[in-house]
Amino acid sequence: MKKKLYEGSSKILYSAEEDFLLIMAFSDKAVLETGETVDISGKGVLNNSISSFLMGKLEMIGIENHLIEKINMREQLIQYVEVFPIQVIISSVACGRFVKEFGMDEGYVFDKPIIDFKVRSREFNYPIVNEYQIFNFGWLTMDEIRTVQAQTLRIYDFLSGLFIGIGIRLVECKLEFGRVFNGEESIIMLTDEISPDNCRLWHINSNEKLGFELIENEPNKAFESYQLIANRLKEK
């Protein structure tokens, strides 16, 4: 029987039979900015499908990631990764904190994508951290930071093109990385998920918000939004 190891806001990790592998299950839960938890029935199934598809596409262009296989409607078999204590947020358009903290007009297009790092800590409200702090805190080496930045840009460029092809704009994406060890050597690997839960996705023509942004404002429309994204990706 599999053992529950960790439960987050939208995913649960279980032990697997093989060493260094885990089972990741997608739930229907979503945590609002207020801290309230809501259920969007069927969201987990769609996120599993979307993330499996996108991770598979990234593997094809040489981006190492934790996905081994999708094993059922809600679960994936994944590689164990020693996850870095940071989130990597890449934005090509003013949204979220750029509007709230800098007073920018939502939708303003940056000349180049902006990469931010945040500490993976709900307790401390995910504070922004810079690369020199990350290095001096002993979390990543400078070479690892550069690798993460380069991979983030490559991932974002690829996904942006893929989403444009289905009439959707990838405005922002939150990524997580970690180390996988092979003896004394290690490689940096993409982990967590890529889904409407951690990507800001807008209709390319109308800028209508899709995915998690709808859960905050129009939760009754959220499932249809996730389903639209999944259906369009199936056609690729």
From Swiss-Prot:
Cite the entry's keywords alphabetically.
ATP-binding, Ligase, Nucleotide-binding, Purine biosynthesis
One GO cellular component term, please give it.
Answer: cytosol
User: Has keyword Amino-acid biosynthesis?
Assistant: no
Kindly give the PANTHER family that the UniProt entry links to this protein: MULTIFUNCTIONAL PROTEIN ADE2, SI:DKEY-6E2.2
- The protein's organism comes out as Rickettsia typhi (strain ATCC VR-144 / Wilmington)
Q: Which domain of life is it from?
A: Bacteria
Q: Copy the pathway line from the protein's UniProt record.
A: Purine metabolism; IMP biosynthesis via de novo pathway; 5-amino-1-(5-phospho-D-ribosyl)imidazole-4-carboxamide from 5-amino-1-(5-phospho-D-ribosyl)imidazole-4-carboxylate: step 1/2
Q: Does the keyword Ligase apply?
A: yes
Cited SUPFAM superfamilies: SAICAR synthase-like (SSF56104)
Q: What is this protein's record name? A: Phosphoribosylaminoimidazole-succinocarboxamide synthase
According to its UniProt entry, the protein's GO biological process terms are: 'de novo' IMP biosynthetic process; cobalamin biosynthetic process
Its EC number is 6.3.2.6
